[in-house]
């Protein structure tokens, strides 16, 4: 039997995996158990009462985290003309059309978000097999296909995150760093959950928010008592 590490022992001693933690207690515990030397991300996993196999129960969208993600977001934008200048001014790292598409086809993937104006989707469409599997394909529902590319760049830089239910009906997303103040993590989670509630499909029946869990990159998952959130 493998020996438990010091951190694993601490987790086993301090975490009750059968308990639903109040948000304040959960974040404090995640902070206490974060002993690695890099700034861990706080990840949310939200189990939804949907049938993801049915197209009328798909859940996807975007939310702006009030305190950002703690991550420097690099943005690629497909547009041209005055909109290209505006995108660059807003902080986009990569702006172009066919030239940018050729870079991506050549293996350049040094970005976290892809934004396109509607007219540019004829170019972006050819990149579906590259961007799609990585969750980077622009989509009107997440605000990444828009005439206002500069505004979308600003939103992405300010901490807007996209969400999409996976095959198990679970939303996964980073909501900040463990070094954030407790209240910042709480308010970021509340913003995500609030927008998830707005995105509830009309066809979804029964309990929609079935379970909310928080974890850090290297830490345990803690179930959150939903009554401790202002949602």
Curated annotation (Swiss-Prot):
<comment type="function">
    <text>Protein L1 is also a translational repressor protein, it controls the translation of the L11 operon by binding to its mRNA.</text>
</comment>
<comment type="subunit">
    <text>Part of the 50S ribosomal subunit.</text>
</comment>
<dbReference type="InterPro" id="IPR028364">
    <property type="entry name" value="Ribosomal_uL1/biogenesis"/>
</dbReference>
<dbReference type="InterPro" id="IPR023673">
    <property type="entry name" value="Ribosomal_uL1_CS"/>
</dbReference>
<dbReference type="InterPro" id="IPR023674">
    <property type="entry name" value="Ribosomal_uL1-like"/>
</dbReference>
<keyword id="KW-0678">Repressor</keyword>
<protein>
    <recommendedName>
        <fullName>Large ribosomal subunit protein uL1</fullName>
    </recommendedName>
</protein>
<keyword id="KW-0699">rRNA-binding</keyword>
<keyword id="KW-0687">Ribonucleoprotein</keyword>
<keyword id="KW-0810">Translation regulation</keyword>
<dbReference type="InterPro" id="IPR005878">
    <property type="entry name" value="Ribosom_uL1_bac-type"/>
</dbReference>
<dbReference type="GO" id="GO:0006417">
    <property type="term" value="P:regulation of translation"/>
</dbReference>
<comment type="similarity">
    <text>Belongs to the universal ribosomal protein uL1 family.</text>
</comment>
<dbReference type="GO" id="GO:0000049">
    <property type="term" value="F:tRNA binding"/>
</dbReference>
<keyword id="KW-0689">Ribosomal protein</keyword>
<dbReference type="GO" id="GO:0006412">
    <property type="term" value="P:translation"/>
</dbReference>
<dbReference type="InterPro" id="IPR016095">
    <property type="entry name" value="Ribosomal_uL1_3-a/b-sand"/>
</dbReference>
<dbReference type="InterPro" id="IPR002143">
    <property type="entry name" value="Ribosomal_uL1"/>
</dbReference>
<dbReference type="GO" id="GO:0019843">
    <property type="term" value="F:rRNA binding"/>
</dbReference>
<dbReference type="Pfam" id="PF00687">
    <property type="entry name" value="Ribosomal_L1"/>
</dbReference>
<dbReference type="GO" id="GO:0003735">
    <property type="term" value="F:structural constituent of ribosome"/>
</dbReference>
<keyword id="KW-0694">RNA-binding</keyword>
<comment type="function">
    <text>Binds directly to 23S rRNA. The L1 stalk is quite mobile in the ribosome, and is involved in E site tRNA release.</text>
</comment>
<keyword id="KW-0820">tRNA-binding</keyword>
<dbReference type="GO" id="GO:0022625">
    <property type="term" value="C:cytosolic large ribosomal subunit"/>
</dbReference>
């Amino acid at each position: 039997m493998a020996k438990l590490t010091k951190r694993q022992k601490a987790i086993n001693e301090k975490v009750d995996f059968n308990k639903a933690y109040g948000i304040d207690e959960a974040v404090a515990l995640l902070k206490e158990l974060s002993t690695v030397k890099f700034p861990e991300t706080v990840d949310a996993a939200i189990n939804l009462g949907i049938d993801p196999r049915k197209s009328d129960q798909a859940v996807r969208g975007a939310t702006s985290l009030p305190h950002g993600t703690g991550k420097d977001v690099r943005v690629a934008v497909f547009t041209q003309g005055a909109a290209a200048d505006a995108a660059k001014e807003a902080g986009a790292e990569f702006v172009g059309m066919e030239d940018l598409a050729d870079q991506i086809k050549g293996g350049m993937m040094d970005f976290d978000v892809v934004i396109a104006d509607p007219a540019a989707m004829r170019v972006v469409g050819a990149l579906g097999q590259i961007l799609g599997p990585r969750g980077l394909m622009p989509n009107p529902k997440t605000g990444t296909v828009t005439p206002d590319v500069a505004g979308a760049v600003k939103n992405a830089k300010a901490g807007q995150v996209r969400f999409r239910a996976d095959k198990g009906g679970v939303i996964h997303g980073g909501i900040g760093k463990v070094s954030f103040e407790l209240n910042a993590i709480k308010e970021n989670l509340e913003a995500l959950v609030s927008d998830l509630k707005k995105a509830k499909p009309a066809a979804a029946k029964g309990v929609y928010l079935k379970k909310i869990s928080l974890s850090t990159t290297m830490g345990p998952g803690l179930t959150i008592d939903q009554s401790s959130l202002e949602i």
